[in-house]
């Protein structure tokens, strides 16, 4: 990093501190800094203006960085909400993470024991729900959506619906039901309009990554914050309101450094949690100690809502597929096995189509756009291999076999494989077919937003 880049980064680090030293001028300064770093390019990493929402005539804007964050600013911008130039909700930054291996030592985490500001809990899979009051209305939000009832991941149920269900189970209040509106729900919970509430809901069978889901969704109180003199602070455990939430808190653990390391090291599949979470009640920081093997499973599963689509990202890697199948339900395994069968059928079909078009020279052959483009890719492979042979003086003996088709198919972008499977299961009508002599279809390889379901 050169001196100019270092100076710029130092300026960003200094400006990021605005989040914890808030004032009207600092709010505007932070908003300007965030907006300077916003990207709308889906292929780039950065900060997104994730959502806007009108609340009784006033427009809120929510900003959130892509995960994992790559700069100090991105690390802090995790569901920050503005009204104009005023920061309405700060949100908690991304957790710092450290992978704990069998060789990790207590010295590596000694800084977490330099003071008593850290609370230790199990790092469980789940989603943070934030609630705040604005312009005569309670807002239930996630990090990326101002309306949690419009935020979904892997499930037909929204995170707002899951939160409401967890509250119904927790309170056992017959007046809190599926039909209750947000304002009434928050009033029933006795929320203070001058404060912001952050809850953690456990993962369901549909929203989980690696750890087994709880039989029913559980809700925990994560923190209560309040903006006092234009500075957001975390409400102390000694505050009178905190007593009413004692039953809603996740159990705190009292572990010394060696015990914390050993706790995380001893976790194994199927994991009860990711590791340990250290939360600092004064600085908004959180630090996560993650079990090494858990992280390996998480990387295989990927942050992809659709289980079948996640599977397409690891095709050709038998070890990863074996790990993947350990994490998913029997129903999803059946779906994956159907995918595997369909892919084998595709390999045979694509090979036959290639022979028909490029060996038998059937220029009138019709096929759909995705297959047409894949056949062109196969033929490009053939021509490149032939040119290599010619350039070295070797006698060309290049053949496009089923093994070649399989290799190129399994190395294709997941959206391409997804479309091929979709078109195999639901063939296009003859009128929608495309001549193999037609030009290639779009080169857009961005992920399919609604992968097929089987």
Curated annotation (Swiss-Prot):
Residue numbers spanned by region Disordered: 428-454
Superkingdom, taxonomy of origin: Viruses
Keywords: Coiled coil
Coiled coil: 330-357
Assigned protein family: Belongs to the IIV-6 393L family.
Name of this protein: Immediate-early protein ICP-46 homolog
């Amino acid at each position: 990093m050169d001196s100019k880049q270092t100076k710029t980064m130092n300026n960003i680090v200094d400006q990021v501190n605005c989040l914890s030293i808030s004032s009207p001028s600092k709010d505007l300064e932070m908003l300007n800094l965030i907006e300077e770093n916003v990207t709308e390019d889906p292929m780039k990493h950065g900060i997104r203006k994730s959502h806007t929402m009108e609340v009784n005539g006033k427009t809120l804007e929510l900003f959130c960085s892509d995960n994992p964050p790559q700069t100090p600013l991105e690390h802090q911008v995790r569901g920050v909400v503005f009204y104009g130039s005023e920061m309405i909700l700060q949100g908690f930054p991304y957790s710092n993470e450290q992978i704990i291996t069998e060789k990790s030592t207590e010295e590596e985490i000694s800084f977490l024991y330099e003071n008593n500001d850290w609370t230790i809990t199990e790092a469980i899979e789940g989603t943070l729900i934030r609630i705040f009051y604005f312009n005569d209305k309670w807002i239930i939000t996630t990090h990326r959506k101002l309306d949690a009832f419009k935020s979904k991941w892997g499930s037909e149920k929204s995170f707002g619906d899951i939160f409401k269900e967890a509250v119904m189970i927790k309170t056992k209040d017959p007046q809190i039901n599926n039909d209750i509106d947000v304002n009434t729900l928050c009033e029933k919970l006795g929320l203070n309009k001058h404060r912001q509430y952050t809850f953690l809901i456990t993962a369901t069978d549909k929203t989980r990554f690696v750890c087994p889901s709880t039989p029913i969704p559980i809700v925990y109180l994560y923190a209560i914050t309040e903006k006092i003199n234009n500075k957001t602070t975390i409400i102390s455990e000694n505050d009178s309101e905190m007593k009413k939430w004692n039953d809603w808190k996740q159990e705190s653990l009292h572990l010394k450094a060696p015990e914390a390391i050993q706790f995380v090291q001893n976790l194994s599949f199927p994991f009860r949690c990711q590791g340990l979470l250290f939360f600092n009640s004064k600085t908004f920081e959180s630090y996560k100690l993650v079990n090494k093997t858990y992280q390996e499973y998480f990387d295989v599963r990927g942050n992809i809502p659709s289980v079948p689509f996640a599977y397409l990202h690891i095709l050709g890697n038998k070890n990863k597929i074996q790990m993947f199948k350990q994490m998913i339900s029997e129903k999803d395994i059946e779906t994956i096995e159907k995918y595997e069968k369909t892919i084998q059928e595709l390999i045979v079909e694509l090979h036959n189509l290639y022979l028909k078009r490029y060996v038998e020279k059937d220029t009138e052959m019709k096929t759909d756009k995705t297959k047409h483009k894949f056949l062109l890719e196969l033929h490009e492979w053939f021509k490149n291999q032939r040119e290599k042979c010619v350039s070295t003086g070797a006698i060309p003996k290049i053949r496009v076999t089923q093994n070649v088709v399989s290799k190129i198919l399994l190395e294709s972008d997941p959206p391409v494989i997804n479309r091929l499977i979709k078109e195999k299961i639901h063939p296009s009508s003859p009128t929608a077919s495309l001549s193999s002599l037609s030009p290639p279809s779009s080169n857009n390889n961005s992920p399919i937003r609604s992968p097929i379901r089987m």
